Amino acid sequence: MFNKILVVCVGNVCRSPTAERLLKRFHPSLTVASAGLGALVGKGADPAAASVASAHDLSLENHCARQISARLCREYDLILTMEKRHIAALCDIAPEMRGKVMLFGHWDSEREIPDPYRKSRDAFEAVYTLLERSARQWAQALNAEQGKP
């Protein structure tokens, strides 16, 4: 059973905080957090990510970027990454995590979700759409696992 989920990207200021909040929206009973492989530790959400999320009635307020660690990984049942290379990096940090690390876009044909950092608002909108779709798919899969419709 996956009750505690960690979402991981690079800086922990664009994709993973948005994905974290979307998963919480679609499956409120989960414990969801986020972290970065090269986190901009202590920073809030990227202003463009926050603006796009806000336009979709999703708040990234009070987000604070944090660095991934082996210890942090061990606290979660499932770790979701944005790119395949993130899975490899996490397995280097904590090899014992290999069986519980998957792509956030797993249910969307194993889709990798590109990094919009320092790109156009259109790039952030496109990434938001991918994140929202994948978050809905994860929520459905997790509900099915728990025997919920």
Curated annotation (Swiss-Prot):
Q: Where is the active site?
A: C9 (nucleophile), R15, D115 (proton donor)
Q: Can you tell which superkingdom this protein's organism belongs to?
A: Bacteria
Q: In which pathway does it act?
A: Glycan metabolism; exopolysaccharide biosynthesis
* Cited NCBIfam families: PRK10126.1
| Keyword hit for Acyltransferase | no
Cited InterPro entries: LMW_PTPase, Ptyr_pPase, Ptyr_pPase_sf, Tyr_phospatase_low_mol_wt
Q: Which CDD domains match?
A: LMWPTP
Signal peptide as annotated in the record? none
Species in which this protein is naturally found? Salmonella typhimurium (strain LT2 / SGSC1412 / ATCC 700720)
Write the Enzyme Commission number(s) for this entry.
3.1.3.48
Q: What is this protein called?
A: Low molecular weight protein-tyrosine-phosphatase Wzb
Q: Which GO terms describe its biological process?
A: polysaccharide biosynthetic process
Annotated catalysed reactions: O-phospho-L-tyrosyl-[protein] + H2O = L-tyrosyl-[protein] + phosphate
Molecular function (GO) terms for this protein are:
protein tyrosine phosphatase activity
Q: What does this protein do?
A: Dephosphorylates Wzc. Required for the extracellular polysaccharide colanic acid synthesis. Probably involved in the export of colanic acid from the cell to medium. Involved in protection of cells against contact-dependent growth inhibition (CDI).
Keyword vocabulary terms for this entry? Exopolysaccharide synthesis, Hydrolase, Protein phosphatase
Q: Which family does it belong to?
A: Belongs to the low molecular weight phosphotyrosine protein phosphatase family.
**Pfam families recorded for this chain?**
LMWPc
